């Protein structure tokens, strides 16, 4: 008799979530019952990369040209990222993988865990490469305990791992973590790319932001199409607006983006735009009605009208894996809401 899976409690009167319904066939993949979910897994599988494929050879020349404020900003962005992927990974391993009973979803989550490891390793390598002083290096690598503004973001995400709230609530919360908490930092690093700086850092950012876009897109697919007990709009707004407030405080006030020559007001507008995009993808109306103020973000690998998986940015897609018909539903930056 196989062991029972971890069950997620539900409120009285709620219908059991199909994704969480006990499934004795959860150990076997075929036959595929959720082709759109399986498609997302194949998209993720086709895009695997490793840290060894990132060339940091020219970055140190640019690093030395940056002023102290620019270096401070980049170091603290990397410090947040170095731990954040581990937080997402722990939630997947401890909660979502135990709760969800659909093999296709588990395949995606299993692959996402592998990619979060690669992301975390990449950020650790970047810190190890750029930061020479060993004490500062350790402070940055342990930023969720040593740097208050990073600790605040991490604490918000970690609390959701142990939360007794419903699966749909936590699904929205971690969509906010990956869709909003990373947005300002991704945007700031793409700003450096626009300036022609740090090619290794900016290319790794392109790959990681593409992956995180897919992860967020996947969470939205599960929620919008398969979650039965959807949250009231007010509850979703509470989660999303809280995440926006924390991200705005982090990227605009604590670091802040003016250190690299970016406008804080425009960055706030961009974060609100990203939040609206997330709300729409979850099936709700926009809240902020903010426009994307950064034209250079229209072409990044979170993707606009050209699907990354068609474009093959940097040729990081395994040949043949995505040769079948591809899904056109993409978590896009430039959708007309």
Swiss-Prot record:
Its EC number is 1.17.4.1. Binds 2 iron ions per subunit. GO terms for biological process: deoxyribonucleotide biosynthetic process. Fe cation 1 binds at residues 85, 116, 119. Gene3D superfamilies: Ribonucleotide Reductase, subunit A. Fe cation 2 binds at residues 116, 178, 212, 215. Its cofactor is Fe cation. It is an enzyme of class 1 (oxidoreductase). Keywords: Deoxyribonucleotide synthesis, Iron, Metal-binding, Oxidoreductase. Disulfide bonds: none annotated. The active site is at residue 123. The keyword Oxidoreductase applies. Belongs to the ribonucleoside diphosphate reductase small chain family. Provides the precursors necessary for DNA synthesis. Catalyzes the biosynthesis of deoxyribonucleotides from the corresponding ribonucleotides. This is Ribonucleoside-diphosphate reductase small chain. It comes from Trypanosoma brucei brucei. The gene is RNR2.
């Amino acid at each position: 008799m196989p062991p029972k899976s971890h069950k997620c409690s539900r409120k009285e009167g709620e219908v059991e979530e199909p994704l969480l319904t006990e499934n004795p066939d959860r150990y076997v993949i075929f036959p595929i019952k959720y082709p759109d979910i399986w498609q997302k897994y194949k998209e993720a599988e086709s895009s695997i990369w490793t840290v060894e494929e990132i060339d940091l050879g020219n970055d140190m020349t640019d690093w030395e040209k940056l002023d102290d404020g620019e270096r401070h900003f980049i170091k603290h962005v990397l410090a947040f990222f170095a731990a954040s992927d581990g937080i997402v990974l722990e939630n997947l391993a401890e909660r979502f993988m135990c709760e969800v009973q659909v093999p296709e979803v588990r395949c995606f989550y299993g692959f996402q865990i592998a990619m979060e490891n690669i992301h975390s390793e990449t950020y650790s390598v970047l810190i190890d490469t750029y930061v020479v002083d060993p004490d500062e290096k350790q402070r940055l690598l342990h930023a969720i305990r040593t740097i208050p503004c990073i600790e605040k973001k991490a604490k918000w995400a970690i609390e959701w791992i142990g939360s007794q709230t419903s699966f749909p609530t936590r699904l929205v919360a971690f969509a906010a973590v990956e869709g909003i908490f990373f947005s300002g930092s991704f945007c700031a690093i793409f700003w450096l790319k626009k300036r022609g700086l740090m090619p290794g850092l900016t290319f790794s950012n392109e790959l990681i932001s593409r992956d995180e876009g897919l992860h967020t897109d996947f969470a939205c697919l599960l929620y919008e199409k398969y979650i039965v007990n959807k949250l009231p709009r007010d509850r979703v707004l509470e989660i999303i607006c809280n995440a926006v407030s924390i991200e705005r405080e982090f990227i605009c006030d604590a670091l802040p983006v003016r250190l690299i020559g970016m406008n804080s007001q425009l960055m706030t507008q961009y974060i609100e735009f990203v939040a609206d995009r997330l709300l729409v993808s979850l099936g709700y109306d926009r809240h902020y009605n903010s426009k994307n103020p950064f034209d250079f973000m229209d072409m990044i690998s979170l993707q606009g009208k050209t699907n990354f998986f068609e474009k093959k940015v940097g040729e990081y897609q395994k040949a043949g894996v995505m040769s079948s018909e591809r899904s056109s539903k993409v978590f896009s930056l430039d959708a007309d809401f």
